[in-house]
């Protein structure tokens, strides 16, 4: 239900917008401004009445469409100019809903407040957004924003949209401004949104618009996001079993976009040449580590406990630890010759750089398997299961499934991450949409050495997975063979906004480069 506010509050909000519009008219601004239709994409939440008052009170806004059961809005409608309001019970995120919305729009721009969000626009925000959209030629525009906090407002900068920003969970904030003409032309050129689409209509529209026009970020806060009662999107939404129908729809939409962009790859793969040079062992388990005194011994013992009919070793690349990790590794290496303790000369290595130290060393085996210094193999058969998978087909990379656990190995949500969405026909294409390949990862080293890892500490595995999948087939194991531990000292613990932006931007850049490379490969 909407939180009812006093009549005076809604009237004040509308009056504030009208007073700003009056000042703009005096300055000769509004006469040159395009008009806007606004849409609120779901039912009322906290303080939605104030947001509604702002929109109906703005001269630029000629229409406000709300999708919600009418009885939830009856009280709010009586407090504002209802001539601008249009109610619908059709889900605007669906194909039929968005089609009907676009057909009803007669203004130059469509302003959408995304599902579950409530905002308060800054003074002059609508005028500023329209100006930037017009002058930049944007088909789709979004902006930075403020968040409410106990100490006041916190600026929330977003990241710029790239050609590779094709993931369906790209963070546009709470508000987007869409050129009506751009939307209609995109649908005329690339086809209408399918009537069967339940959740991905905006995603499909965005990708179609981006094929010809810019998606523009306005790096100024245009609104304050009011705290909502819903939590943030999960890091593992794309592999949550409860979301598989949703994810399948998103994959279909992304696949069509990749085909239009001429970067979609058919399921034909380059064969792996198994006539490799001699290696000291069949397999090496690679553990990069820095300052994991609490967990590194568990990881190493898990690796050394593997049973196999072939020789293997464990290569730990100790990235100049300062917390006692080095001493623990020295003790373990002294008691088991299979443990190779490497300390690189370079002091500027990320996780990817540490992987390079291991795979280019003379100790590395023919197959390199991943084990993070926080994590454990599920049992003593993990090594055997992964290496056996390489023998089934011409795989350059094999990926298993894992279970997320706490420090004491108790399963925590979402539990099993098995990437059941992966298919031989389309897995490497859908990999451009999602955020990761899974774990544990294993590589055929002769091919891995030709590629190498980027010297980063985030996304280095994703970069290599994309590069390998461009040419070679990736094998999958769907049973859990790995424990991924989450605890307060873990590098996958909750990230701050700046780190999340940096990581998301880097992965979008990787996708951009990979899409360019695939397009060139297909044109040769």
What feature does the model see in each segment?
Residues 154-182, 420-442:
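A recurrent flexible, glycine/aromatic-enriched loop bordering the glycosyltransferase active site
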Residues 195-205, 457-464:
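Acidic donor-binding loop at a coil-to-helix junction in glycosyltransferase catalytic cores
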Residues 32-47, 66-69, 283-295, 299, ...:
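A conserved hydrophobic helix/loop-capping motif in glycosyltransferases and polysaccharide synthases
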Residues 28-31, 52-62, 301-311:
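Short, acidic, metal-binding catalytic loop of nucleotide-sugar glycosyltransferases
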Residues 68-76, 117-119, 318-328, 347:
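A conserved acidic beta->alpha catalytic loop
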Residues 92-104, 345-363:
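Glycine-rich, basic loop-to-helix element that forms the pyrophosphate-binding segment
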Residues 216-226, 398-401, 475-481, 486:
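Catalytic beta-strand/loop signature of glycosyltransferases that borders the donor
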Residues 123-155, 381-414:
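Conserved donor NDP-sugar-binding/catalytic core segment of glycosyltransferases
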């Amino acid at each position: 239900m909407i939180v009812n506010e006093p009549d005076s509050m809604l009237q004040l909000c509308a009056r504030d917008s009208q007073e700003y519009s009056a000042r703009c008219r005096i300055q000769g601004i509004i006469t040159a401004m395009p008009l806007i239709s606004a849409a609120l994409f779901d039912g009322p939440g906290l303080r939605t009445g104030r947001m509604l008052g702002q929109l109906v009170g703005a001269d630029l806004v000629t229409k406000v469409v709300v999708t919600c059961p009418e009885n939830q809005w009856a009280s709010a409608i009586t407090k504002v100019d209802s001539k601008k309001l249009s109610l619908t019970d059709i889900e605007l995120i669906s194909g039929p809903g968005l089609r009907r919305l676009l057909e009803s729009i007669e203004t130059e721009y469509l302003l959408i407040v995304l599902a579950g969000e409530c905002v308060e626009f800054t003074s002059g925000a609508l005028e500023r957004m329209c100006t930037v959209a017009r002058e930049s030629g944007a088909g789709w525009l979004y902006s930075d924003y403020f968040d409410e906090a106990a100490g006041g407002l916190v600026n929330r900068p977003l990241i710029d949209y790239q050609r590779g920003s094709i993931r369906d969970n790209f963070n546009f904030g709470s508000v987007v401004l869409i050129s009506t003409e751009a939307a209609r032309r995109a649908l005329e050129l690339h086809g209408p949104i399918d009537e069967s689409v339940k959740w991905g209509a905006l995603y499909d529209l965005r990708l179609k618009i981006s094929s010809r026009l810019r998606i523009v970020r306005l790096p100024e806060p245009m609104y304050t996001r009011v705290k909502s009662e819903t939590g943030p999107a999960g890091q593992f939404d794309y592999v949550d079993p409860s979301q598989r129908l949703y994810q399948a729809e998103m994959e279909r939409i992304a696949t069509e976009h990749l085909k239009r962009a001429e970067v979609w790859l058919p399921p034909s793969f380059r064969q792996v040449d198994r006539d490799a040079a001699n290696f000291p062992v069949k397999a090496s388990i690679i553990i990069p580590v820095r300052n994991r005194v609490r967990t590194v011994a568990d990881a190493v013992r898990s690796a050394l406990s593997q049973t196999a009919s072939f020789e293997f070793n464990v290569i730990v690349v100790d990235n100049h630890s300062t917390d006692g990790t080095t001493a623990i590794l020295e003790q373990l290496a002294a008691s088991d010759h299979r443990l190779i303790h490497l300390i690189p000369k370079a002091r500027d290595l990320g996780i990817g750089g540490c992987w390079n130290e291991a795979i280019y060393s003379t100790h590395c085996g023919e197959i390199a398997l991943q084990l993070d210094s926080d994590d454990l193999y599920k049992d003593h058969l993990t090594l055997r299961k992964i290496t056996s998978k390489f023998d089934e087909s011409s795989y350059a990379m094999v990926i298993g499934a894992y279970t997320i656990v706490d420090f004491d190995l108790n399963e925590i949500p979402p539990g099993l991450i098995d990437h059941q969405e992966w298919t031989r026909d389309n897995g490497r294409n859908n990999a451009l949409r999602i955020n990761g390949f899974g774990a544990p990862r294993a590589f055929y080293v002769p091919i891995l050495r030709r590629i190498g890892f980027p010297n980063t500490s985030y996304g280095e595995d994703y970069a290599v997975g994309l590069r390998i999948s461009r040419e070679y087939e990736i094998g999958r194991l769907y049973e859990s063979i790995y424990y991924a531990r989450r605890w307060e000292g873990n590098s996958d613990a909750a990230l701050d906004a700046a780190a999340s932006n940096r990581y998301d931007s880097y992965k979008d850049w990787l996708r951009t480069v990979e899409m360019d490379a695939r397009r060139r490969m297909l044109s040769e």
